[in-house]
Amino acid sequence: MLKNKAMWIVCLALVFMLAGVMSLSAQPNPRDLGRAPNALRGLNIVVGNYWADYDTTKNPPTAQWNGSESQERTLEWRRRIQRDNGFTMQEKNIASWNEMPQIAATSIMAGRPAATVFVVQADWAMSLQKQGLLYPISDSRAIDFTTKNKVVEINQMINQLFTFQRKTYAFQIGYGGSLHGQVIFFNKRLFREAGLDPDLPYDLQKNGRWNWDEFLRICKALTRDTNNDGIMDTYAMTADLSTEILDIFVAGNNSEYVSKDARTGKLVNSTGTPAFIEALQFAIRLQREGVMMPKPDGAAWDWYKPMFNDGRVAMRMEQEYVRQDIANMRDDWGMVLPPKGPKARDYVVFTDENVLVIPSKGFTPQQVDAILWAVQAWNVPVDPRWQTALYPVFRDQRAVNETMAMIRDPKNQKFKNHILVPGLNRGSIAWEMWWFDGEPAQLVESVSSSWNTRIEDANEL
């Protein structure tokens, strides 16, 4: 499953990671960047990732090229900054998703980093930091890592996560660029055939009424026996992936699996909180209400994908990157955030981000200044209309103007802290919730000891 996820990220990440779509400014102006560090001249910078290449010396520079005006202007800008400042820079696929953590760690330990800058998952970066393998980027004054940066938007959620004893070890530009936010995709045709407005989720979301009560009402309307033979022909959703389904309601109730103690910074098991138990109860209730298509006997693990893609179920709950999987669906579709539960006042973007890190070995402080300056310059937005690059990705503008606008808003962000705990699998709850013979609180209690042990171990690393 994780390999398939990585494949879709390959197709999408170049558009949003290091592409400047989360824009703040108008036309890029070299003067906004300030004077380039002297150490930049003659430097060759490789931004190592696990999905695809971007090389400005090639035409097209990447396999994900569509020739849009935005892409053309980005390419022109990136060629210009290299030419004017005497350096070279490229994004390079240096490893597979499975290989990247080891290649990053071993190459840095050996003093021969496989890349100048690594783009890695947050949990990988945390492991690298705890091994002393990351450069404290906050020691550099080449770019402003605060909200005062007027050239690019620095992700403050990531800054806070990777700041230890007043030093910061990882950063990201913009919000939502890793496409990991939990969302609900919905089939407009099935809404219409059930007598519902095909834009109903958008309308409810916009009006602040996209909540569990409305969601359940809609699910019941979407689950239909269309030919009166006693067998349901369409369902609101599938019973898989149960982990993604539970994520939706945990997020929607402003809860989480693992939280951070505001005073100590330690990770804390949050599955026993009232908000989490309430989310688990609601997920189980949906299954018992009969609005979820059960897994067919003998079906593959990913059976749920064609059920939505082929119009058998009306909604699919997953991370945002799945929009590539449904790009060629015959039916039109939309995308909204998780509906609000009783404990939530606002919509929540439950997400994590890939992060950018610089190795602790192999570069002088002057070179780090130059590298950071170049990364910022590479990511200067070429189009002040952040929507421009997104409209072609979706079937309607409301997904961009409304849902994506909320995904980009820092105040809606909630980081998936559970990914920072090695060996912790939320499936130990989600995989069991349809079949557990007992109360939701008892299911949580049955795994609490192992969860607490793993969280304690993570805090001691």
What kind of region is each of these model predictions?
Residues 2-14, 20-131, 366, 382-389, ...:
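Conserved N-terminal structural module of periplasmic/extracytoplasmic solute-binding proteins
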Residues 28-43, 49-50, 95-98, 122-181, ...:
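Hinge/lid segment of periplasmic solute-binding proteins
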Residues 94-103, 208-214, 295-309:
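Short helix-initiation/N-cap motifs at beta->coil->alpha
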Residues 129-132, 138, 155-202, 239-264, ...:
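Periplasmic solute-binding protein
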Residues 138-153, 205-207, 235, 255-278, ...:
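Short, solvent-exposed loop/beta-turn-alpha elements that line the ligand-binding surface or hinge
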Residues 166, 327-393:
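Extracytoplasmic/periplasmic substrate-recognition and gating elements
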Residues 208, 225-234:
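Acidic, glycine-anchored loop motifs typical of Ca2+
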Residues 216-221, 249-252, 256-297:
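Glycine-centered hinge/linker elements that transmit conformational signals in sensory
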